[in-house]
């Protein structure tokens, strides 16, 4: 669609205390929408693509302009409705209602396929919102760094006596999500070999400090990895220009043994996200326009080849995990009957955190001043003094993570801490300690906000993997509680037909009204995750629910 391409337009969120909307409650979503399209943040801002293949912030540039205009005239007792990246209505509500309600990429289940989506997308009736692209709370690769770091650290505990020092990880994909992997690996003490087919993505990760080195030579890459494995050597992350469907099997053939194997290519989208083996980027780009069925068939066959290599590593006893891009499902569809022999990362490493409502809590400084983030970092340490792992993360993040767009931070905290931090940040705005309001949000990948049987809800204890009532309830409760904007999406992470998920963002503007909303929303949101896992029979979640005094009738 030509109305999606504008090479002349550069979008950047305003900074500072002056606003162009009628209040911070509408200025905040305006700035975060614009921040999603900042060239420092977005993968292809000229096409409105933020990350994740074709995850967009708005349906087309006309729709973007209409959203911006609607936000600038929005009153504090009105709510803007956004349907798959298009502003479709402004309605009278009340001051504590969300200023924006967003629904992206949702399809009736029988029609929830990429084929149906692409037809609607080509007709200009829909866009793919991914998770935080269409919900306007993407913060660049930092948004996934800590979750990836936590996963790698837990893998070290589980498989290697507590540490990944001297070990190395093999992966594919350095896009908006996958680009977090190299930095997360070296933070966790491991080296990484990351295979990426697009030079621009490797260069972007080098530029932002997420990646240490690049090469197109596999032997050179392996030599660097070997050097970093020597006693006393520092871990290194290497971006290898190549195709994972070719490199992974070659490593198996050579008898190379990584210490952990995973993948974050955009396999969720076989048309736009995965380069078929043997194809050039130019052939791939032409094929997507002229012969999409051929591209999809070739991509899925290549995914099957990569998964067979991952299964070979798994059979050798090497820890191997799916990192949530649905590559196992694609391989299964191509006849790899044992594609699910290795687990997803959530049941393997993350679910115990979800049982306590712990997940990706993120915030951004609307002032644009990094000092506001550093002050909030200090506040987190002050309010959670007895978590050395969290403190280590915050110290490493300040030292090693480059801000992309508006300064922001992510840290994994849970029920009981999120609302305390939110209230503290709001008080810092009120006192003038922060130069402008902050927004608090999260990934849709959280404990109570997603149904995704091949990722977040894989292998639930009670078999409820595919029950999607939970993210709907999460969105409804956050709307009732007064989040500033709430989103409900389909297909994020794993593609059409495989997930439903909800997001929320709340503004800390220093007001007493904001404090009341924050107290409700940032308690209720993680509490739904504890509720969901308690209902599934997880003892840790049941204990957490009782400890926190949650009123869950099924517990008696």
From Swiss-Prot:
Cofactors (names): NAD(+)
GO cellular component, one term: cytoplasm
PANTHER family, A to Z: UROCANATE HYDRATASE
Swiss-Prot/TrEMBL catalytic activity: 4-imidazolone-5-propanoate = trans-urocanate + H2O
UniProt entry keywords in alphabetical sequence: Cytoplasm, Histidine metabolism, Lyase, NAD
A Pfam family assignment: Urocanase
Binding residues annotated for NAD(+), in chain numbering: 52-53, 130, 176-178, 196, 201, 243-244, 264-268, 274-275, 323, 493
EC number: 4.2.1.49
Superkingdom per UniProt: Bacteria
Pathway the protein takes part in: Amino-acid degradation; L-histidine degradation into L-glutamate; N-formimidoyl-L-glutamate from L-histidine: step 2/3
Function of the protein: Catalyzes the conversion of urocanate to 4-imidazolone-5-propionate.
InterPro entries (alphabetical): Urocanase, Urocanase-like, Urocanase_C, Urocanase_central_sf, Urocanase_CS, Urocanase_N, Urocanase_Rossmann-like, Urocanase_sf
Protein name: Urocanate hydratase
Entry's family note: Belongs to the urocanase family.
Active site positions, chain numbering: 411
Highest classification ranks of the organism: Bacteria, Pseudomonadati, Pseudomonadota, Alphaproteobacteria, Rhodospirillales
GO biological-process terms attached to the record: L-histidine catabolic process to glutamate and formamide; L-histidine catabolic process to glutamate and formate
Cofactor binding remark: Binds 1 NAD(+) per subunit.
Location(s), subcellular: Cytoplasm
GO molecular function: urocanate hydratase activity
